[in-house]
């Protein structure tokens, strides 16, 4: 949900709290626990869970490798659950004409630099740039072209916008900021 008035525009940005990330985290942790249990079952010589048979798996080398993959998967799953819990990457883009300032705010990982805020002047914005790559893995990203700096992405790299939505978003923002659009 965007907010726009005559002087202010706020575009919220979704972070890592997405349904696909929840599914991947859940599947990853379940698979990792299964691998770990089968590996430990092969070490003990008996099945810890009746559904997961380890009778044909010798501890050296298969069982130890399954334990390693299971533990690595648990750590990776823990990392993914933490990014979902902290909602890393979420935030907003705020364009304030009254103050003449653009704020790009994102949440990062906990610590000293959890709040990431990039600020620059609206008068330094040269254009809105669209990067469109079609094919097997399409990529559609909006950038702010700023004088003397590299282009700043406004949308996530994995955000799946249709070409029409991308053009509408770029046109609305260019109209609000009174700049041109590049990269058709």
Swiss-Prot record:
Keywords, sorted A to Z: Chloroplast, Membrane, Photosynthesis, Plastid, Thylakoid, Transmembrane, Transmembrane helix
Disulphide bridges: none
A GO CC annotation given for this chain: photosystem I
One GO BP annotation of this record: photosynthesis
Pfam families membership: Ycf4 (PF02392)
Keyword hit for Plastid: yes
Membrane topology summary: Multi-pass membrane protein
Regions crossing the membrane: 22-42, 64-84
InterPro entries named among the record's database cross-references: PSI_Ycf4_assembly (IPR003359)
The keyword Membrane is annotated on this UniProt entry: yes
Subcellular location as annotated: Plastid, Chloroplast thylakoid membrane
Physiological role: Seems to be required for the assembly of the photosystem I complex.
Family as reported in the entry's similarity comment: Belongs to the Ycf4 family.
HAMAP family given in the database record: Ycf4 (MF_00437)
Entry-linked PANTHER family: PHOTOSYSTEM I ASSEMBLY PROTEIN YCF4 (PTHR33288:SF4), PTHR33288
Name the record gives this protein: Photosystem I assembly protein Ycf4
Protein species of origin: Angiopteris evecta (Mule's foot fern)
């Amino acid at each position: 949900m965007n907010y726009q008035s005559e002087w202010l525009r706020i575009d919220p940005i979704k972070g890592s709290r997405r349904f696909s990330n929840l599914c991947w985290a859940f599947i990853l942790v379940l698979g990792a626990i299964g691998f770990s249990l089968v590996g430990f079952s092969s070490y003990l010589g008996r099945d810890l869970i009746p559904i997961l048979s380890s009778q044909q798996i010798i501890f050296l080398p298969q069982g130890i490798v399954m334990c390693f993959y299971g533990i690595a998967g648990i750590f990776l799953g823990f990392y993914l659950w933490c990014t979902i819990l902290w909602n890393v990457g979420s935030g907003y883009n705020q364009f304030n004409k009254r103050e003449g300032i653009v704020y790009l705010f994102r949440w990062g990982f906990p610590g000293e630099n959890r709040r990431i805020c990039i600020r620059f002047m609206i008068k330094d914005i040269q254009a809105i740039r669209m990067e469109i790559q079609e094919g097997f893995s399409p990529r559609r990203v909006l950038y702010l072209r700023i004088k003397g700096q590299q282009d700043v992405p406004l949308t996530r790299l994995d955000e799946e916008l249709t070409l029409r939505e991308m053009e509408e978003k770029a046109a609305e923002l260019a109209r609000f900021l009174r700049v041109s659009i590049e990269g058709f």
